[in-house]
Amino acid sequence: MRTLFVGDLHLSTDRPDITQAFLRFLDTQLHDTDALYILGDLFEVWVGDDIAEPFAEQLAKAIYQASQKLPIFFIHGNRDFLISNAFAKRSGMTLLPEIYTVDLYGIPTVILHGDSLCTLDKPYQRFRKFRNLGWAKWLYAHLPKSKRLDIAVKLRSKSQSSNQQKSYSIMDVEPDAVLELLNATKTEQMIHGHTHRPAIHQLANGRRRIVVGDWYEQGSMLSVSQDKIELIELPFGK
């Protein structure tokens, strides 16, 4: 048996190939699997359940069907932090806090989306802190649909422009932040996404940091079993 992790799919109507690849993943890759964890940014953008497009409901039904075979867990990403517990429940997913610890075949493991670890990106961290304020979420949720969509488009455009000007190191996780979280959670292993830089990093004292891959050019999943850790590519169309 194994446990699977995916993240950073950025599903949208603009990329039906990714949507089809994910649906195929749900149909073909969940055999002999104890659980599936989705580590955020399942959607390219999510501005509220009331603006969910038909394809999102299609995905909700597919995920729900898969959840009848195994438990599926979801952690918010920076693109879909407004996904509600109601939508998660409708999809058969259990909504987890942004930092969560799990015993993974005897190894204490902390899992998260990963954006909170990019502490050198000061402007983004300030925005993230504001975004997570309860009153800010309430205010945004009560804006007209058209206004929320307009804000989402502008924020995405600003983010893409800003990222082009940021250095590689600023947009990656900060090693001190990784160590601090491992110590705070008393864990030996960390699994996250967000950076789109899949890798298995061996750290000091036998610790490990694993980054799941994105789904831009191909699918990607992390498979963890009792005796094997593997990042697996899933070519589109296969």
From Swiss-Prot:
Mn(2+) 1 binds at D8, H10, D41, H196. It is a peripheral membrane protein. InterPro entries: Calcineurin-like_PHP_ApaH (IPR004843), LpxH-like (IPR043461), Metallo-depent_PP-like (IPR029052), UDP-diacylglucosamine_Hdrlase (IPR010138). Pfam families: Metallophos. It is found in: Cell inner membrane. Pathway: Glycolipid biosynthesis; lipid IV(A) biosynthesis; lipid IV(A) from (3R)-3-hydroxytetradecanoyl-[acyl-carrier-protein] and UDP-N-acetyl-alpha-D-glucosamine: step 4/6. Mn(2+) 2 binds at D41, N78, H113, H194. It comes from the Bacteria. It catalyses: UDP-2-N,3-O-bis[(3R)-3-hydroxytetradecanoyl]-alpha-D-glucosamine + H2O = 2-N,3-O-bis[(3R)-3-hydroxytetradecanoyl]-alpha-D-glucosaminyl 1-phosphate + UMP + 2 H(+). Keywords: Cell inner membrane, Cell membrane, Hydrolase, Lipid A biosynthesis, Lipid biosynthesis, Lipid metabolism, Manganese, Membrane, Metal-binding. Its EC number is 3.6.1.54. One of its GO terms (cellular component) is cytoplasm. Its cofactor is Mn(2+). Its main location: membrane. GO terms for molecular function: manganese ion binding; UDP-2,3-diacylglucosamine hydrolase activity. Substrate binds at N78, R79, D121, S159, N163, K166, H194. GO terms for biological process: lipid A biosynthetic process. Hydrolyzes the pyrophosphate bond of UDP-2,3-diacylglucosamine to yield 2,3-diacylglucosamine 1-phosphate (lipid X) and UMP by catalyzing the attack of water at the alpha-P atom. Involved in the biosynthesis of lipid A, a phosphorylated glycolipid that anchors the lipopolysaccharide to the outer membrane of the cell. This is UDP-2,3-diacylglucosamine hydrolase. It comes from Shewanella halifaxensis (strain HAW-EB4).
